[in-house]
Swiss-Prot record:
The lineage of its organism: Eukaryota, Viridiplantae, Streptophyta, Embryophyta, Tracheophyta. Belongs to the plant globin family. Residues 2-147 form the Globin domain. Its main location: cytoplasm. This is Leghemoglobin Lb5-10. Disulfide bonds: none annotated. Heme b binds at S45, H94, R97. It is found in: Cytoplasm, Cytosol; Nucleus. It comes from Pisum sativum (Garden pea). The keyword ATP-binding does not apply.
Length: 147
């Protein structure tokens, strides 16, 4: 079964919830990443020279980009059944930064935890699954572009 209209709607509505507190949700997202994989701090230029996760325009922009790409992936999965990267350099950027498979797992866990918090009472297993499938589609496309 392909990605459904309902799954896309769940991703879109929770994306809007995420954006309502972009600063707080961005900090939460990167805090979870660094709790799970402290060495990943060096992968993010905007975190390299900081003591911890500090709010900044670059941090917010990157979080918004990651979550936005997952939202866009949901739309592609529904309409095309696969994710095609709009930015051909994403694979090369991830290779250059030294991103490996375990990093994708950590980011996925952080993304799902952040969406759960951002969604509040609207969170459900169905919403979680929609984000998980959309993220997996994006991660697969990025990994393919990394080879």
């Amino acid at each position: 079964m392909g990605f459904t209209d309902k799954q896309e709607a769940l991703v879109n509505s929770s994306w809007e919830s995420f954006k309502q507190n972009l600063s707080g949700n961005s900090i939460l997202f990167y805090t979870i990443i660094l709790e799970k994989a402290p060495a990943a701090k060096g992968l993010f230029s905007f975190l390299k020279d900081t003591a911890g996760v500090e709010d900044s325009p670059k941090l917010q922009a990157h979080a918004e980009q990651v979550f936005g790409l997952v939202r866009d992936s949901a739309a592609q999965l529904r309409t095309k059944g696969e994710v095609v990267l709009g930015n051909a350099t994403l694979g090369a950027i991830h290779v250059q930064r030294g991103v490996t498979d375990p990093h994708f797992v950590v980011v996925k866990e952080a993304l799902l935890q952040t969406i759960k918090k951002a969604s509040g009472n609207n969170w459900s297993e169905e919403l979680n699954t929609a984000w998980e499938v959309a993220y997996d589609g994006l991660a697969t496309a990025i990994k393919k572009a990394m080879t």
